[in-house]
């Protein structure tokens, strides 16, 4: 049996081997290409990245030529190192280090030796390139910013690292890739497809012809142009209004979910992350953790929402049927909700939903929140019902927008409080601060903007997004999917009536814009930090949300100014100016505009530069840079995230 089996196995193996050799040699030419690799030079043709335009067709980001010196280590011969280093203004130590790095990548494949030469450096090297065997010029395209704003929206491009090369076979050493912003989100559209040329070499390593007449060559495909939803003029104006302030602005077109402005402050000129100084500038921005210019507050900062959250408290109470628009409560400058527990309020008298919202009465909203929770036999059930309503507004979750960064905020559930109070019971009184947007609730500015957009739409929203058009491409269908909240449409009208009178009778009565019906809500959130073991009061935050016009709204906006005192001090005026700018295309309230543009919170931020607070920042794992870089005139200070109680009522 063994005598028969062994020859049979050998025969079958031989047949398989012959078939494989036939396939590789006759059918599959790729092996021949690989075997000839020692006599073939590979050259890449890099396409231009797609241009970036705003919603109105204004060019924001174009391209400029860049030149890299590439090296193939095995081809470097008879090099005059002194002359070479002198020409490129590098030291011999730098030369040795760069060559060693190239050899590690591959002795036979090209990699970047020196990147992003300017035109003068390129011309000088090109004249004598023939003297330096193994080196050649690779042309690429770098970004050429047409504007000085929008850095957080655009992101930047940088060289790929080893991990990217390992995980994605498209990229080779020296290739560029988008990081942050739309450059990262839409990398595959913007980058295009690089072309490849295979060049036959002779025994003297000289180029002689295209390999096999160019049979394996591919043509570069240019990147796709894109239009953003951003209104360039509104974005620019928002950044100007936030100079010398810290915070975020997010403006959305309610009926589509298109992001009209996404402002973070402080910011920087995107042009500083282009060219030979890009790495140095990025490092300085990255380590500037006082100003944190790379931190997009509109998407990443999780704040206590303060009084604007009362909008949701009211809508959920209406939906749960625990109140109607005429349900009333008496306020005595506050609310005694438990023994020894008193929630302050600036209001007094009888409040129903309408004046409760425009006067921002803490007493009113604390009562209706407790009624919502107490509707159910167990507070845990009540909290989960309340929480599920809020999830339908996009709270407590990543919203699915098309930017590569973000936070989901914090939305407490019964599990939250079972964990917080494991040894004793809790009820609606224990967690009543949720009623006014404090307690355990945290929201990002984009969530606040989406919340007020939902109110403007009377109960629905489209996922906020930054892309409007891709040339030759299709917008993701998730941005065309309508999301409906759990709150019935009929409950939004009485709430909107109260928000409209915030501008007519309430906390924003001095911020009206002639000819525009605005609905909005002020917010003031107290701010505390623990310093040397003590709870210390810091300056309050200023918050404002609004939409306009009241009917057929065109813009919904959220503004958050850190340490901005109260809602109507900074966030309110900035909101009304942004609305006027977008709808009217001009500003009529010149004095107010001047005050906001020239106003600065630098003196306030300087108070928090004392050593105890700096030590607090260090303990919260924030590394401080001794040399912060800021291109625009922003103050550089940050504070640890602290949950706050809102006692002002506005």
What kind of region is each of these model predictions?
Residues 474-479, 594-602:
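Intrinsically disordered, low-complexity charged/polar segments
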Residues 61, 202-207, 211-215, 255-307, ...:
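Beta-lactam-recognizing serine transpeptidase/beta-lactamase-like catalytic domain environment
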Residues 525-527, 601-604:
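Short acidic/His-enriched helical or mixed secondary-structure segments at domain edges of catalytic enzymes
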Residues 1-277, 302, 382-392, 435, ...:
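Periplasmic/cell-envelope proteins involved in peptidoglycan metabolism and beta-lactam response
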């Amino acid at each position: 049996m063994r005598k028969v089996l062994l020859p049979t196995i050998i025969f079958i193996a031989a047949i398989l081997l012959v078939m494989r050799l036939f396939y590789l040699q006759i059918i599959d030419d790729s092996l021949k290409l690989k075997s000839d690799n020692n006599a073939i030079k590979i050259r890449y043709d890099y396409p231009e990245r797609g241009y970036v335009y705003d919603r109105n067709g204004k060019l924001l980001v174009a391209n400029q030529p860049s030149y890299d010196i590439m090296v193939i280590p095995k081809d470097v011969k008879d090099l005059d190192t002194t002359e070479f280093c002198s020409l490129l203004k590098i030291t011999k130590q730098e030369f040795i280090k760069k060559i060693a790095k190239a050899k590690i990548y591959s002795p036979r494949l090209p990699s970047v030796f020196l990147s992003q030469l300017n035109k003068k450096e390129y011309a000088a090297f090109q004249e004598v390139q023939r003297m330096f065997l193994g080196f050649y010029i690779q042309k690429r395209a770098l970004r050429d910013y047409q504007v000085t704003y929008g850095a957080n929206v655009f992101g930047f491009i940088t060289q790929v690292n080893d991990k990217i090369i390992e995980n994605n076979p498209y990229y080779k050493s020296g290739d560029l890739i988008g990081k942050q912003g739309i450059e990262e989100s839409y990398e595959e559209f913007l980058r295009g497809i690089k072309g490849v040329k295979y060049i036959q070499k002779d025994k003297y390593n000289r180029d002689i012809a295209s390999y096999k007449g160019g049979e394996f060559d591919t043509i570069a495909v240019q990147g796709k142009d894109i239009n953003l939803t951003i209104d360039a003029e509104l974005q620019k104006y928002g950044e100007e209004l936030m100079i010398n302030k810290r915070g975020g602005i997010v403006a959305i077109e309610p009926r589509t979910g298109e992001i009209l402005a996404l402002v973070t402050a402080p910011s920087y000129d995107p042009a500083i992350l282009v060219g030979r100084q890009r790495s140095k500038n990025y490092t300085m921005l990255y380590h500037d953790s006082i100003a944190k210019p790379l931190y997009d507050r509109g998407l990443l900062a999780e704040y206590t929402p303060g009084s604007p959250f009362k909008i949701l408290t009211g809508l959920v109470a209406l939906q749960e049927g625990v109140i109607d628009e005429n349900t009333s409560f008496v306020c005595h400058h506050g609310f005694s909700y438990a023994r020894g527990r008193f929630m302050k309020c600036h209001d007094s008298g009888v409040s129903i939903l309408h004046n409760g919202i425009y006067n921002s009465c803490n007493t009113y909203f604390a009562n209706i929140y407790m009624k919502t929770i107490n509707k159910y036999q167990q507070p845990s059930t009540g909290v989960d019902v309340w929480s599920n309503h809020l999830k339908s507004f996009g709270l407590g979750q990543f919203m699915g927008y098309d930017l590569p960064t973000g936070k989901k905020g914090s939305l407490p559930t019964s599990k939250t409080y079972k964990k917080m109070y494991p040894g004793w019971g809790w009820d609606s009184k224990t967690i009543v601060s949720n009623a006014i947007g404090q307690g355990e609730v945290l929201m990002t500015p984009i969530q606040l903007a989406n919340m007020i957009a939902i109110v403007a739409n009377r109960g629905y929203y489209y996922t906020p997004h930054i892309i409007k058009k891709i040339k030759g491409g299709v917008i993701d269908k998730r941005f065309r999917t309508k999301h409906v909240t759990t709150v019935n449409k009929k409950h939004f009208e009485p709430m909107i009536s109260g928000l409209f009178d915030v501008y007519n009778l309430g906390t924003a009565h001095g911020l009206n814009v002639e000819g525009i019906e605005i609905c909005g809500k002020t917010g003031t959130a107290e701010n505390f930090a623990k310093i040397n073991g003590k709870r210390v009061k810091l300056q309050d935050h200023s918050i404002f949300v609004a939409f306009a016009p009241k009917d057929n709204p065109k813009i919904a906006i959220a503004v958050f100014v850190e340490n901005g005192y109260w809602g109507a001090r900074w966030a309110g005026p900035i909101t009304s100016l942004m609305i006027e700018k977008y709808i009217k295309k001009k500003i009529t309230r010149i004095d107010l505009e001047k005050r906001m543009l020239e106003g600065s919170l630098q003196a306030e931020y300087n108070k928090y530069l004392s050593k105890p607070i700096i030590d607090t920042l260090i303990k919260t794992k924030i590394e401080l840079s001794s040399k912060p870089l800021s291109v625009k005139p922003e103050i550089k200070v940050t504070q640890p995230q602290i949950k706050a109680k809102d006692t002002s009522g506005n």
